[in-house]
Every structure is written in C-alpha cells, then in structure tokens.
C-alpha cells in the first residue's frame, strides 16, 4: 500500500487549530514549559534551523492561519533523517505521538515539492 502524506502529531490539540499538534509544536511547548534539558533544546533548534534552511515555510503557517502540514512521502526521504532527532526527543521525554500516513488530507491550500498544508476548522480538516 502506498501513502501520499505523512504527519507526526501529538495527542494534545493545538489551541489554534483544535487539531493534534505537530512535532514542532510539541517540542516548542516542552521548551516553553521548561521540560527540555538545554542540550536537547539545542539539538531541537538545530533541527528547526535545518528545516528553515532547506524547506520553504508555507505562507499560511507564517501568517498564523488555522492550517496543518503534512510531509509528502514521495519526497520525504531526505527530511525523515533530519526530523528523527525531534522524534527521539518525544521518546526521551515520554511524550506521546502518532505517525499518521494517509492519502486524504482535505483541501490543499499550499503545496510545494516536500509538503502540503490544509485548512482546519473546529479540529477537522476541510
């Protein structure tokens, strides 16, 4: 079976989207709550820096719109090893998450070679 999209998400909802937080949001929350050790925060910031340098940031995300993003599985090969340290931090701090593979993500409002963004309303993709 082939999947078009993949998302790493938590089991707690974002206060903005009312949809499960993505991996970046979960890590930032742990940092803001003082739950992450300084060397782990440094590691996470290196992950973020790599993504900023290598992927476009979707305009709807920059604008704070109610959207969630998915990696495209067909081009995620280079990104997955780069996101892995953040996933290991979830494991280290015993923070629950799910890796979701799907072909159905709702109406795409932003798309590039590596990712797609969809609008979320009342905790549901539209």
Predicted feature locations:
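Long, contiguous N-terminal structural blocks used for assembly/anchoring
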Residues: 1-76
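A residue-level detector for conformationally permissive "hinge/kink" positions
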Residues: 2, 26, 86, 105-106
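Residue-level detector of alpha-helical secondary structure
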Residues: 45-48, 52, 80, 84-87, ...
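Acidic, proline/glycine-rich low-complexity IDRs
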Residues: 88-126
